[in-house]
Amino acid sequence: MAGFRLTTKVQVSGWRFLLRRVEHAIVRRDTRMFDDPLQFYSRAVFAGVVVSVLICLGAALMAYFKPLGKQGSDQLLVDRTTNQLYVMLPGSNQLRPVYNLTSARLVLGNASNPVAVKSEELNRISKGQSIGIPGAPYATPTGTPASQWTLCDTVAKPDSSAPKVETSILIRTLAIDSGVGPIRADQGMLVSYEGANWLITEGGRHSIDLADRAVTSAVGIPVTAKPTPISQGLFNALPNRGPWQLPQIPAAGAPNSVGLPENLVIGSVFRTATESDPQHYVVLPDGVARVNNTTAAALRATNSYGLMQPPAVEASVVAKIPEQVYVSPLPDQPLDVLLRQDSPVLCWSWQREPGDQAPKTTVIAGRRLPLPASAIGTGIDQIGGDSTVYIEGGQFVRLQSPDPRVGESMYYIDPQGVRYGIANDDAAKNLGLAGPVNAPWQVVGLLVDGPVLSKEAALIEHDTLPADPNPRKVASGEG
């Protein structure tokens, strides 16, 4: 056997060394081989082969124990080809096409996601009629919970004979700056609704008779001021703070019987003489009453009883007279009446942060909607609600209905601004909704009303979907 050994192990080892040295010289341009990283190539190849074998083995095991495109025990399925949703009702061997994921989750009683199955697999299973809630949202995603809800009117061409009012609903954080902000205590805005005139202040709305110049001039309404219309929604949202008119004084014009000078008849106005900022009083049948400057001016404009100026009376004399109360709704000082030409936007905002005991309401006016620049142009022009909705994702809300017989109600508001009633807590849980936020009915009630989301409604069979009774053609240029 020794005669057939043409090479020795040392020769083979030397040949391999020289081969590696040549490779080293070609790759690294250095024959000294102080280190030899190329020796790890074979180890890397071996490791790669091992990993590939393990991956293939794992894929084979997954395909055996959990094959894709097979129904298995899943009850919520989706066709991988057509994306049609199906549910397998408990205790049934029929597949039911379902209109939307919302209905499927209500039927099954959980917020599971559909499993993709091949069409061939689905075609082997018996099928029943379609079920679900027509008009329900496909799903019920939620965004950042909104703590601020705002209703705005924007008047176009306020100087015209028929100004146009556009309503916007803002379910998002507002952007307040010098162009739009809360009405101050010394500001007001003149509006009209159904033929009546109202003055809007920071606290709400006050009915006012523009023909009563004694009151209007006292509160700062110019004779040229023109009221502009507001929407029904904004009118109802603004709280009614009562009329701005002077209470009648009994026996006005009759002589006083409280010891004042004869020229001060009942209903006349006088002032104290010793104070640096004179206090005005009105004479009543059984005494005198303090009034603010605006009320004093309105009373004198109504009837000054021949007095060019309010007479001055010693404070010591006034102190001996019984003091009564004259309830006047007029503000302490005249208002700065905002013109709709300069402030075409009027808003009512409701805000309740976590931990607040009660909501805070604000009246806002300005040149534009209180929206950040990034939100301009994101409004959804609703068909049935006559409003443009600006909303940051879906919202799950709980609110107190104005009808005490109804009590609390839960709603889901989808990203399109449509509200859907939630039947009960179980329905909300099955849809994956939790932690409802408070919201005002004054705003939520103006959104387009969708169907109630309940398990009973989702278990109704249909041959076909009903047609929308109020469709709208897509604007030209969009289709």
Curated annotation (Swiss-Prot):
What the record says about disrupting the gene is: Loss of DNA conjugation when disrupted in recipient strain, strain does not secrete EsxB.
**Molecular-function annotations in GO:** ATP binding; hydrolase activity
Regarding the membrane, this protein is recorded as: Single-pass membrane protein
Periplasmic side of the membrane: what ranges? 66-479
Instruction: Give one Pfam family.
Output: T7SS_ESX1_EccB
- An example Gene Ontology cellular component term from the record? plasma membrane
The cysteines covalently paired via disulfide bonds are 152-347
List all membrane-crossing ranges.
45-65
Q: Which InterPro entries match?
A: T7SS_EccB (IPR007795), T7SS_EccB_R1 (IPR044857), T7SS_EccB_R3 (IPR042485)
| Protein's cellular compartments | Cell inner membrane
- Swiss-Prot/TrEMBL keywords: ATP-binding, Cell inner membrane, Cell membrane, Disulfide bond, Hydrolase, Membrane, Nucleotide-binding, Transmembrane, Transmembrane helix, Transport
Q: Which domain of life is it from?
A: Bacteria
Q: Membrane side Cytoplasmic: which residues?
A: 1-44
**Complex and partners:** Part of the ESX-1 / type VII secretion system (T7SS), which is composed of cytosolic and membrane components. The ESX-1 membrane complex is composed of EccB1, EccCa1, EccCb1, EccD1 and EccE1.
The record's misc note reads:
DNA conjugation in M.smegmatis is unidirectional with distinct donor and recipient strains; mc(2)155 is a donor strain while MKD8 is a recipient strain. Mutations in a donor strain that alter DNA transfer do not always alter DNA transfer in a recipient strain.
Give the family from UniProt. Answer: Belongs to the EccB family.
Q: What does this protein do?
A: An ATPase. Part of the ESX-1 / type VII specialized secretion system (T7SS), which exports several proteins including EsxA and EsxB. Plays a role in DNA conjugation, in both donor and recipient strains.
The name under which this protein is listed is ESX-1 secretion system ATPase EccB1
This protein's species is Mycolicibacterium smegmatis (strain MKD8) (Mycobacterium smegmatis)
